[in-house]
Amino acid sequence: MKRKRLRFRRIRKGFYLTLLFEKYGKWFIWELKRFFVPLALFIVIVSALVFISTKDFPWREWKLSQGFYRDVFCEKIRSGSIRQPFNAWSSLIFIPIGLWMARRAFLDKVPSPRLSPIRRHKRYGLLFGISLVITGVGSWFFHASLTYVGHFVDVIGMYFLGGFLFTYGLSRKLRQSATAFLAVYAAVVVPLVLFQWFNPEASRYAFGALILSALGIEIGLHKSLSNKLFVVALLTLGLGFFIWILDEKKLLCWPQSCLQGHAIWHILTAIATQLSYLYYLSEGPRVNWKIGYRAGKYTWMNRYWKR
């Protein structure tokens, strides 16, 4: 009798494990595919940058940026290939987030007019992700070299990112198509890039104007202050900007420490952009999962929309 009970318990346990695998196992495999490619690409990019950092580049032969002479950042300028290591390596946090966005743009494309544009068209997610990758690589290059070219590449990434936030909000407000969005995006970013080459000192003001304009559009679009993701992203960005000011004014400054205010600014800004992306995804009806049942066998999970 005890053996029969034990055998029944084992069968019941195996049945429940089968149900759990059918319910969560395939979902886990799908999520693993989503993160595997970005993780592999991130490892390749970091390995390439580590290899570059082992080489001795003569940065002094390049035209140096104004930040080198004015000592804008708190971190001590070191000799070698990486002049500001903590500010440089903290910039790489933008890269995995951008790669994840670009990968998700391919996997999560759902053709439904009820969803937000960033879910209906993969070009939005791709452009958002690529701008973050360029921001990370450009910021690393700038803090590693402190050269004029490095500053230019760094600001290009900032304009790509700020231009996307501004143009995406404007396209949703005006109900533009994806093609019109790309045209407006190019009309916003290209003049800023050309202006940056001739007037590099105005970059922070132009980038600040883009961010403030994007925030104003989001608040006026559908009262985004009621959305928790938007509020947390806004608070995170504000905290990062406050720490950046303290670092620049040397009020929060330890030159030889691993704790750098500008590095914290990089991390908080990357978190704010990730929250902004999740906020964009939260627009429209939620996409949920359910298990299909057919002929005594659990089938692949299907999507359905629920407000």
Language-model-detected regions and their locations in the chain:
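Early transmembrane hairpin module of multi-pass membrane proteins
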Residues: R7-F8, R12-L182, A187-E201, S224-R307
